[in-house]
């Protein structure tokens, strides 16, 4: 599984890429592989305020519907509208064009609670399954 070194990870299989006080969020390669073919994404509303661990949107695949959780507290500033017409971007490019939303970070200290790439690799290597969130 692809686990980029420049990201941080939630135990529920979301990734977070920091850009100053903002962050981009999507689901991991492991999560998309467990879901199989993504057919629909319910995007979060721009302006929505969320807390870390709060369910923010839903990704549906031919296999299951999965809640997606915000890995950090803040305000949604953008949603990836390209997923409305091409939800398979989550499968083909989960860390690039398949991003789901952007968030203005409210509580920077929450970043410390996320997993490093190495910790996330341990989680998916030892779990034998998708765990929570998938």
Where are each of the predicted segments found?
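Short, Lys/Arg- and Gly-enriched loop/turn segments at beta-strand edges
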Residues: 60-69, 86-88
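Acidic, low-complexity mobile loops and tails
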Residues: 1-55, 92, 96-134
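Aromatic- and Lys/Arg-enriched surface recognition patch
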Residues: 77-101
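Short, glycine/small-residue-enriched coil/turn segments at secondary-structure junctions
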Residues: 2-4, 68, 72
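A short, compositionally biased micro-patch
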Residues: 18, 61-62, 71, 106
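Short, charged/polar surface micro-motifs in flexible loops or helix N-caps
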Residues: 32-33, 46, 73-76, 81-83
